[in-house]
UniProtKB/Swiss-Prot annotation:
Family: Belongs to the PPase class C family.
UniProt cofactor note: Binds 2 manganese ions per subunit.
InterPro entries recorded: DDH_dom, DHH_sf, DHHA2, DHHA2_dom_sf, Mn-dep_inorganic_PyrPase
Lineage top rank: taxon: Bacteria
UniProt name for this protein: Probable manganese-dependent inorganic pyrophosphatase
Length: 311
């Protein structure tokens, strides 16, 4: 059987990398020849999780077709979020928990998606269905992914399935998930040593909304006022990125992981800003607005933006 690469989205988070590792282990147990790779360097939070459970970060690839003919995707499906030459390889499997958009294939494939908080929750279910024993390190990295995506089960995306998976995986991994989870999340909040340009690209995704190219980035912090001291520098970096990459709107969500509130910074045309204001029923003040209780890009940001841009 020919080798296949497994990877998550660009600017990978803990779910994108952790689930790729877990899926590669599962598929290899089932007779496939796979390797987990990444479409970018691991962030600080992910590095903390990888180190905790004894993994080295997957190697980073820029293209896939120079290595393999087929790939498996986790934690994404939209082509603009995938490897640059996704149109040159065959997608044989997808496991995801996001909306399906601009995705089509020439051949039938395995596609599994569910509205849960994290792709690793689906992966945990797949291990159980296949009756494949989950090793301690794999359990740990899947646990880390769920904690990351659900903000320690506090995100509105959290489901009973996520909670069940966390309990089971923490037991296998041998950790107190609340204590470990808080340490892991805090490891990803150190922004002092990073440039604004790096921060707005660390966890960012592009969305095509009714012909508009919308970029939504998110950074997690424990000190929101400190992060907002860099507001003007953030806006400058966002504006420059929009001009160079052709974004019609760039939104940066700065989320306080301790109180589950966010502040949004927005750059773009007057028309796109008006659509942002309509989406969240609010008014921007100097390109900034508070978004109380908003922590999930997938559930609380993209759906209202989609509705506003398509209205």
């Amino acid at each position: 059987m020919a080798k296949e690469l497994i990877f998550g989205h660009q600017n990978p988070d803990t779910d994108a990398i952790g689930t790729a590792i877990a899926y590669s282990y599962l598929q290899n147990k089932l007779g496939y020849d796979t390797e987990a790779v990444a479409l970018g360097e691991a962030n600080d939070e992910t590095k903390y999780a990888l180190n905790k459970f004894g993994f080295t970060a997957p190697r980073v690839i820029k293209t896939a077709s120079n290595e393999v003919d087929a790939v498996m995707l986790v934690d994404h499906n939209e082509p603009q979020q995938s490897v640059s030459d996704i149109d040159k390889v065959k997608v044989t499997h997808v496991v995801d928990h996001h909306r399906i958009m601009n995705f089509n294939t020439a051949d039938p494939l395995y596609y599994r998606a569910a509205p849960v908080g994290c792709t690793s929750t689906i992966m945990w279910q797949m291990y159980n269905e296949k009756e494949i024993e989950i090793p301690q390190d794999i359990a740990g990295i899947m646990l880390s992914a769920i904690i990351s995506d659900t903000l320690l089960l506090k995100s509105p995306t959290t489901t009973d399935q996520d909670k069940e998976a966390v309990e089971a995986l923490a037991n296998i991994a041998g950790v107190n998930y609340k204590e470990y989870g808080l340490k892991m999340l805090k490891a990803g909040t150190n922004i002092a040593d990073k440039s604004e340009e790096d921060l707005i690209d660390l966890d960012a995704k592009s969305f095509e909304l009714n012909g508009s190219n919308v970029r939504v980035a998110q950074i997690n912090v424990v000190d929101l006022p400190e992060a907002l001291e860099r507001k003007e520098a953030f806006l400058k970096a966002m504006d420059e990125a929009s001009k160079s990459e052709g974004y019609d709107m760039f939104m940066l969500l700065i989320t306080n992981i301790l109180d589950s509130d966010s502040e949004a910074l927005v750059v773009g045309s007057d028309e796109s800003k008006a659509k942002f204001e309509k989406a969240f029923n609010t008014k921007l003040s100097d390109s900034e607005v508070k978004l109380p209780g908003v922590v999930s890009r997938k559930k609380q940001v993209v759906p209202p933006l989609t509705n506003a841009f398509e209205a």
